[in-house]
């Protein structure tokens, strides 16, 4: 718990402007938050930041924010508060987000300094790498916290969260909760948004791990170079967010570039690049399970048995191993732990006794879609079909390439709705379909492209199409259990829909495939 005077003088330093005289005192501060409806205690500061439509200061008198003992805002927020006749202490800074991380960390007692913190960033593979780290660390005898896309866990207990990387106040409160539970290691996914917006500011990272970089989030980042620079905040020596140590997969040009700017880096490769950690002797079973050897510094090697299919998961596992090694985790135990990993909605097999392969995967960016389809092609003797869509209000430039790459690899591409959000679903589908048709024209094999807006129906058609020895994948939503359409989230789980369609097919209840387009 921090008093208001120390917060203003010590943490905000010279950034504070226009602080009313009655703001200076020994008022105890136990929490800070951005959400007016969920501020956790009355001994709290409400942080009011500008939003896309309104300024957060407009909500200072509503819900739990009305009980806050002070308000942290910028000059524009101060104007709003003055017009509303605000009488509570108002701390004014140039940029609230720039100081929010450090302030939040201090209020909660700098919790990330009390455990080993490992951050995983990159376009694809963050969730799987984090799961591999969690299980490996647990097998090595550590008490582990996990923060990521599929949720948050404290020593195996689920904790609800909304974002891949929570806002700084929520994150520091989570860290404090983990510290108080005796957690020794925390693994978290760190998005480019989190780095750019300062959500992880004030956090002390022992290791940062970089998976890869490919097209995504170009609605937020104007260029791929800008996207790279956001990730590089975790690795550059001159960045305030730099981790103490870094591990970087150098199997693509972006990884090689990241390694070249990193401060204290060890490298990873599964494709024969010169690296500190490498994977060799890779063997793949008929089920897709993999065994391989990780070669570590000082001529050490470790045998790994991995249930997860795909060459990209060998890379994820080797990166996870390297990150753990950098903080002194026992390698043999860590390797054993990775063998136990299954990740919801990531290459997740759905088996109802059918004689073809059915998979649900979170792939929702071009490179990920290509990697999943390439992996499945190696596991089947027959044809390959995919249901694919693209999210609304997100990077629109990846829609065509997702369709194109799908049709270059599959025999059947069914374009459907993903999460349209506020966009017109047909407009999104048209872009994906155009890409798929282009890919079909470029393919050496005959490719059928269908457009079926109803996602459940698209899945039913895909399942009915499949014959013995074929493979099908429903891509895009993975672990998600809702579909966001026009501001409303409807329950929808790809895994449930695939199981239902398989059950109907096996019970001979599905109608024959009809021509749909």
From Swiss-Prot:
Keywords from the UniProt entry: ATP-binding, Cell cycle, Cell division, Cell shape, Cell wall biogenesis/degradation, Cytoplasm, Ligase, Magnesium, Nucleotide-binding, Peptidoglycan synthesis
Coiled-coil region(s): none
Residues binding UDP-N-acetyl-alpha-D-muramoyl-L-alanyl-D-glutamate: 34, 36, 164-165, 191, 199
EC number: 6.3.2.13
Modified residues (N6-carboxylysine): 231
Pathway where it operates: Cell wall biogenesis; peptidoglycan biosynthesis
Keyword Cytoplasm found: yes
Subcellular location: Cytoplasm
Cellular component GO terms, alphabetical: cytoplasm
Any GO BP: cell division
Protein residues bound to meso-2,6-diaminopimelate: 394, 418-421, 476, 480
Its job: Catalyzes the addition of meso-diaminopimelic acid to the nucleotide precursor UDP-N-acetylmuramoyl-L-alanyl-D-glutamate (UMAG) in the biosynthesis of bacterial cell-wall peptidoglycan.
Protein name according to UniProt: UDP-N-acetylmuramoyl-L-alanyl-D-glutamate--2,6-diaminopimelate ligase
UniProt lineage: Bacteria, Bacillati, Actinomycetota, Actinomycetes, Mycobacteriales
């Amino acid at each position: 718990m921090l008093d208001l005077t120390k917060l203003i003088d010590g943490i905000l330093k010279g950034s504070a402007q226009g602080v009313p005289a009655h703001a200076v005192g020994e008022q105890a501060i136990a929490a800070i938050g951005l959400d007016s409806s969920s501020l956790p205690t009355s001994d709290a500061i409400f942080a009011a930041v500008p939003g896309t439509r309104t300024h957060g200061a407009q909500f200072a008198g509503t819900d739990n924010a009305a009980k806050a003992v002070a308000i942290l805002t910028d000059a524009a927020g101060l104007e709003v508060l003055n017009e509303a006749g605000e009488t509570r202490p108002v701390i004014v800074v140039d940029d609230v987000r720039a100081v929010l991380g450090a302030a939040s960390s201090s209020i909660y007692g700098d919790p990330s300094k009390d455990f080993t913190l490992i951050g995983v960033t990159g376009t694809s593979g963050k969730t799987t790498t984090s799961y591999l780290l969690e299980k490996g660390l647990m097998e090595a005898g550590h008490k582990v916290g996990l923060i990521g896309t599929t949720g948050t866990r404290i020593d195996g207990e689920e904790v609800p969260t909304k974002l891949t990387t929570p806002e700084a106040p929520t994150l520091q409160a989570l860290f404090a909760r983990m510290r108080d539970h005796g957690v020794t290691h925390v693994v978290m996914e760190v998005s480019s948004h989190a780095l750019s917006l300062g959500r992880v500011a004030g956090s002390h990272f022992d290791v940062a791990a970089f998976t890869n970089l490919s097209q995504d989030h170009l609605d937020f980042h104007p260029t791929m170079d800008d996207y790279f620079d956001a990730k590089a905040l975790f690795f550059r020596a001159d960045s305030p967010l730099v981790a103490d140590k870094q591990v970087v997969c150098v199997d693509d040009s972006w990884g090689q570039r990241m390694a070249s700017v990193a401060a204290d880096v060890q490298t990873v490769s599964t494709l024969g690049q010169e690296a500190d950690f490498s994977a060799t002797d890779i063997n793949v079973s008929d089920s897709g399970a993999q065994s391989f050897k990780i070669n570590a510094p000082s001529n050490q090697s470790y045998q790994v048995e991995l249930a997860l299919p795909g060459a990209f998961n060998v890379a994820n596992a080797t990166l996870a191993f390297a990150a753990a090694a950098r903080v002194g985790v026992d390698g043999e135990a860590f390797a054993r732990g990775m063998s136990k990993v299954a990740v919801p909605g990531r290459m997740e097999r759905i088996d109802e006794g059918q004689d073809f392969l059915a998979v649900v995967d979170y792939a929702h960016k071009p490179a990920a879609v290509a990697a999943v389809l390439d992996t499945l092609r190696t596991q089947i003797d027959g044809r390959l079909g995919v249901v694919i869509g693209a999210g609304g209000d997100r990077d629109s430039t990846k829609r065509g390439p997702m369709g194109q790459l799908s049709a270059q690899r599959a025999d059947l591409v069914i374009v459907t709705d993903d999460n349209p959000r506020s966009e017109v679903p047909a407009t999104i589908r048209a872009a994906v379909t155009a890409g798929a048709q282009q890919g079909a024209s470029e393919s050496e094999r005959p490719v059928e492209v269908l457009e079926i807006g109803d996602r459940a129906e698209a899945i039913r058609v895909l399942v009915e199409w499949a014959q013995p020895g074929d493979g099908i994948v429903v891509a895009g939503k993975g672990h998600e259990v809702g579909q966001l359409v026009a501001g409303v989230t409807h329950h929808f789980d790809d895994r449930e829909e695939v199981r239902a369609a398989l059950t109907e097919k096996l019970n001979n209840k599905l109608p024959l495939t009809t021509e749909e387009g």
